[in-house]
């Protein structure tokens, strides 16, 4: 459908007296915003929500007592108390803020023999760059200077210049533990970020509360102007879709009846439809695993971008890491903590052969997504676990409330009887077979 523009420009005519002009203008009917159809509303809402989720995260981060822009926060190592923890890396994070005259500088230490990356994302969740040995083989460490778009500000000699998509960016760093947590933490603390001056930093715009359990209603359109003005979007459909957002914002503001109509469509059709897409269709379902292999850079697909921001904000690109999420067994039945299962990797398709860095698999309970306590304090396996292979060179991982007959206990990942669970398989530095969707972890097969 065609949506009206936001305003009508009336050019004064010198030859007409003010009184006559007033009469003429009084006879022109006022423009009324058109009611959108469901598809147009869905497109605009999902697009706007994507930026809203990123703003929500900035507000959450900025509320921390020690928060400052251009200062790294060194996260403590993941523990069993975290939600869906990554027990394989030491994390660091920051918000970068620059202006035309003021770059920010990142110092990356020399790291050898273990995986690391510094992921830089824009304010919509698009990955700008990863800084590591793979992406900067001639300079994997040293000084990296972040500058605003179009900025000609000088940077230190020898620094690598990286142009951001806007005046802010999110930084997420990861350093592989590799069986040496103390060494990883020592390296983590050597990453440093600082501004080259005092940049002008705009606070994140005010937005209505966004709850994942009950997504925001039409009130998000009341904030459309500040939300869209707060960050440049590289999506090729941005200009077109933002016009749809503005038109619907005008319609919502036109009266209580219009707002009620939009809220009804959101509640009954748009939000349920989007959640169904995000949870079941936003990523491929291969070999009974949900595969997050198309994230990080989304092109025109802002629906996939918003899904990623909702389900796990700041997703990385598949060339860096691919996640497989398992919620169902080989019969497509929900994974049950009371049952026993086996994952059987063929000898010619072992997980370590599919990655350039490392792999891991972790079990968490559902719906709390926390690791399952057990007497072995065993929550995950990875490249460095002492897994015993089969005589033919294949490898089995057993899953269940007790060891599985025929599988070494060293290969047993405990579950909690009576509770459903989820598996997350992470492949860091995935090789071509994973990226090309030719390899997935084996299906989680029930033991009869």
What are these regions (language model features)?
Residues 1-11:
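N-terminal secretory signal peptides that target proteins for export/translocation
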């Amino acid at each position: 459908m065609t949506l009206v523009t936001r305003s009508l420009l009336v050019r004064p005519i010198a030859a007409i007296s003010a009184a006559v002009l007033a009469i003429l203008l009084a006879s022109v009917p006022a423009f009324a915003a058109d009611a959108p159809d469901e598809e147009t509303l869905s497109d605009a809402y999902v697009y706007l929500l994507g930026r809203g989720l990123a703003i929500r995260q900035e507000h959450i981060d900025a509320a921390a007592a020690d928060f400052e822009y251009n200062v790294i926060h060194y996260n403590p190592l993941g523990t069993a108390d975290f939600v869906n923890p990554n027990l394989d890396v030491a994390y660091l994070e920051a918000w970068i803020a620059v202006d035309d005259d003021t770059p920010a500088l990142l110092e990356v230490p020399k790291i050898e023999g273990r995986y690391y990356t510094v992921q830089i994302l824009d304010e919509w969740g698009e990955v700008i760059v990863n800084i590591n040995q793979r992406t900067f083989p001639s300079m994997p460490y040293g000084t990296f200077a972040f500058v605003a778009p179009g900025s000609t500000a000088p940077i230190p000699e020898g620094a690598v210049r990286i142009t951001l998509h806007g005046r802010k960016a999110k930084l997420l760093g990861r350093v592989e533990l590799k069986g040496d947590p103390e060494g990883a933490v020592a390296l983590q603390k050597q990453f440093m970020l600082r501004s080259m001056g005092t940049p002008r930093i705009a606070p994140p715009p005010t937005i209505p509360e966004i709850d994942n359990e009950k997504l925001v209603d039409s009130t998000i359109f009341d904030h459309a102007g500040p939300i869209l003005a707060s960050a440049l979007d590289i999506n090729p459909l941005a200009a077109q879709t933002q016009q749809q957002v503005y038109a619907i914002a005008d319609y919502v503001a036109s009266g209580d009846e219009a707002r009620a109509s939009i809220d009804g469509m959101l509640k009954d059709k748009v939000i349920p439809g989007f959640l169904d897409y995000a949870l079941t269709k936003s990523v491929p379902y291969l070999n009974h695993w949900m595969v997050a292999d198309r994230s990080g850079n989304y092109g025109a697909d802002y629906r996939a971008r918003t899904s990623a921001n909702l389900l796990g904000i700041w997703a990385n690109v598949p060339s860096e890491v691919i996640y497989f999420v398992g919620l169902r067994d080989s019969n497509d039945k929900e994974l049950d903590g009371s049952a026993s299962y086996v994952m059987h990797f063929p000898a010619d398709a072992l997980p370590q052969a599919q990655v350039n860095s490392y792999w891991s698999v972790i079990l968490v309970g559902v719906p709390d997504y926390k690791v399952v306590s057990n007497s072995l304090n065993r929550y995950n396996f990875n490249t460095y676990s002492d897994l015993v292979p089969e005589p033919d060179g294949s490898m089995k991982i057993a899953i269940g409330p007790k060891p599985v007959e025929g599988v070494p206990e060293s290969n047993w990942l405990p579950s909690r009887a009576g509770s459903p669970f989820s598996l997350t398989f992470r492949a860091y530095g995935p090789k071509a077979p994973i990226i090309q969707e030719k390899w997935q972890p084996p299906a989680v097969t029930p033991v009869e």
